[in-house]
Amino acid sequence: MNILSLVQTALELGLICSLTVLALFLSYSMLNVCDLSTDGCFTLGAAVGATVAIAGHPYLAILAAMAAGVLSGFITALLQTKMGIDSLLAGIIVNTGLYSINIAVMGGSSLLNMNKTETVFTKARALLQGTVLTEQYKLLVAVIAVAAVVVFLTLFLRTRLGLAIRATGDNPDMVRSSSINPAFTTIVGLCVANAFTGLSGCLLAQSQKSVSIDIGTGMVTIALASLLMGQVLLGKGSIFKRAMGMVVGAFAFRLVYTIALRLDMPAFMLKLVSSVIVVLAIATPYFKKQLPMLRRRMAARKEARRYAED
């Protein structure tokens, strides 16, 4: 097993998927909305991006995928804020509807092949030809995309609108009393978050040079696991630190996932691996809190035994 190759593969996929984790960070951690349309939106971004790239516009494909994500987020937010539908149910409804839309975008097929299609990655490889970064062209594109999103998110959440979005997640009643419409901030937050998800799907499709209808299946679980791992690894702090925690968490998750693949683990077991990682990530903070209490109990028992022996 080539360790460097394994780490590079995990880093490339981790960075691309970290865009979805950052989307979940905005919607779930900041806005306090459980958006279950992530799977469908990811596939939508991949399908739209692949279709536009096949038409000969790889750069335009990125913008189109993000626009499709914005539209998906807008519909999800509209169901919640204007129709009184619970956020969980709204996400499920949109995710279900997106399956048919994604098939339609892909021309009625469940698989798109992009082997002969020029992508942002092939353009980057041609640009870096003959340099020391020739073999790292995918990694470079992923780093640029993630850096741009992290910087944007850090600056955006410091603006008045960004602060209003954060306040909406913390206390919507206070936001409402401050003459800020929480419905508006929810719509904007979900539109931005889903734009990141669409971008993530588009980049993964162009990286793999293929799109299947189930490319986004389980993505919300993967993103949640990565988010929780990032919180455990880097903890709380500034927006930039927390955003970087999402990137680190995505890489850590993909590293474990890639190792499982290299160990010839059956494909049907990988979903179980994802579930176990989620459980461990959620339970770790709890066990950290319980550890001092456990130590005190053990110390008390030792003290009691010492007195009993005396």
Question: Can you annotate each of these PLM segments?
Answer:
Residues 1-20, 48, 54-60, 131-136, ...:
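Membrane-interfacial amphipathic/re-entrant helices at transmembrane-helix boundaries
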Residues 13, 87-89, 116, 138-143, ...:
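Loop-to-transmembrane alpha-helix initiation sites
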Residues 24, 57-96, 249, 253:
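Alpha-helical transmembrane segments within multi-pass membrane transporters and channels
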Residues 29-34, 74-128, 209-213, 225-244:
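Short loop segments and helix-boundary regions at transmembrane helix junctions
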Residues 72, 135-215, 220:
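Helix-loop-helix "hairpin" substructures at the membrane interface of multi-pass membrane proteins
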Residues 87, 91, 98-158, 187-188, ...:
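Transmembrane helix-bundle core of multi-pass membrane transporters
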Residues 170-177, 181-184, 256-310:
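Cytosolic-side transmembrane-helix boundaries in multi-pass membrane proteins
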Residues 196-271:
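Transmembrane alpha-helical segments in multi-pass inner-membrane proteins
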